[in-house]
Design a protein with these regions (language model features):
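Alpha-helical transmembrane-bundle signature of multi-pass membrane transport and export proteins
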Residues: 1-418
Length: 418
């Protein structure tokens, strides 16, 4: 009987995926524990929204720089060191929570430092995917990484974070810190060197940044996808930054059941990751992208209009599945269309816009909740805006195909009609 052995490329993908999965589990625990910790220090919706804004603000400040850096160094090493840095920051936060010396302002500082390390870890990790998966398996690989993100951050991290916070407030932060250590150790199994253009003549960081931005400026499809991605992030974060208040105040859930609510979202996210490649095969990338944005909007609008826990949980699952499908399409388009040596810089520019829109949306969402009187109303507004965004995407992409094209064609701005 023949024994099937995995290829070196398969094993490298497994090591990177394992590290990403554990890192996402740690991140998921923190994404629930930090807002819950914040609600013990303040119940002001603007201050709660400011926590999300603080976590993502580094993408506005350092996203481009992080992208340029990961195009100059070994990407595996950059990801490893960033995970170690995140572990240290959360370890110090654990001590603050345990001793009772934590304040909302210290929470903001920790969130800012974590977000800064995340710009390196995410840029490096995302740029590694084509190197370990290959162009022919990008759709499948991106679906696996999306599934790992949803499984870790929502399906497991959410319930673990809320349950352990209810037991002992410092416990989830301890698990969070340990998880990033494990994620860093797993990267040691990723053999090979991952420095782009190794051996090339040294260049100035500023020149590298300019080269990446010039390439993006001459790629009309990527420009449109960046705009659509940024608007999707902004309109979605209006509501997502208020999720903890929506669950605790509008739905009257407890801290522990908030994790179960997130668990349903995890189920939807996993379904979206599993179905996305099949949907792309059946319909193409563009219908999945546009339809996914529209369904996200309908789900959030429904959550705002029908504030019943079971209905809201189901709709949140629908939202999670749809947003994962959207993310798979966007990630695959980036990897397929951007040259490998420019991937870090283009990703940095992309994340600066898309993830930089998140703190803006979070702050606006906090203001909307204060103005309208409930987080549920903010969900309704967010949903209607996302439905409108789906219509905008139809117009913006009407002359373009999202099927993989050689990077040089995009560099010339090649267009194709449907």
């Amino acid at each position: 009987m023949a024994v099937r052995t995995s290829s070196p490329r398969d094993r490298r993908l497994e090591w990177l995926l394992s590290s990403s999965a554990i890192g996402n589990l740690a991140d998921g625990i923190g994404k629930v524990a930090f807002p819950l910790l914040a609600t013990t220090l303040t119940h002001d919706p603007v201050q709660i929204g400011a926590l999300s804004a603080t976590q993502f603000a580094p993408w506005l400040l350092f996203g481009l720089l992080a992208g340029a850096l990961v195009d100059r160094v070994d990407r595996r090493r950059a990801m490893l060191l960033a995970n170690v840095g995140r572990s240290v920051v959360i370890g110090l936060t654990t001590i603050g929570v345990w001793t009772g010396s934590i304040s909302i302002w210290l929470v903001y500082v920790a969130a800012m430092l974590l977000g800064t390390a995340e710009t390196i870890a995410e840029s490096a990790g995302n740029a590694l995917i084509p190197a370990v998966a290959g162009q022919d398996r990008l759709e499948s690989a991106n679906s696996k990484f999306q599934a790992a993100e949803i499984l870790g951050q929502v399906f497991l991290g959410g319930p673990v974070g809320s349950a352990t916070f209810a037991l002992f407030a410092a416990f989830p932060f301890l698990l969070n810190s340990a998880g990033f250590v494990v994620a860093a150790v797993l990267l040691l199994g990723l053999t090979g060197r991952y420095r782009p253009n190794e051996g090339a003549a040294p260049t100035k960081l500023r020149a590298d940044l300019v080269d990446g931005l010039k390439w993006l400026a001459r790629a009309p499809l990527l420009r449109r996808l960046v705009i659509i991605g940024g608007l999707t992030a902004l309109t979605g974060e209006l509501a997502q930054a208020q999720l903890v208040l929506y669950a605790l105040d509008d739905l009257q859930l407890s801290n522990a059941t908030f994790g179960l609510f997130a668990f349903v979202g995890g189920i939807g996210g996993l379904a979206g990751a599993a179905l996305a490649p099949r949907l792309v095969t059946l319909t193409g990338r563009k219908p999945v992208l546009i339809g996914g944005i529209g369904v996200c909007g309908l789900a959030f609008a429904g959550m705002g209009l029908f504030r019943q826990p079971v209905v809201a949980a189901v709709l949140f699952g629908v939202f999670a599945g749809s947003v994962v499908a959207v993310n798979v399409v966007l990630a695959t388009a980036r990897h397929a269309l951007v040259p490998g040596e420019l991937l870090g810089r283009v990703l940095g520019a992309w994340r600066t816009v898309v993830w930089g829109a998140i703190p803006v949306g979070a702050l606006l969402g906090g203001g909307l909740t204060r103005l309208l009187g409930s987080a549920g109303a903010t969900f309704a507004v967010s949903g209607f805006l996302q439905v409108a965004l789906a219509g905008f995407a139809v117009l913006a992409l009407r002359r373009f195909s999202l099927s993989a094209e050689p990077a040089h064609d995009q560099h010339r701005g090649a267009e194709r009609s449907h």
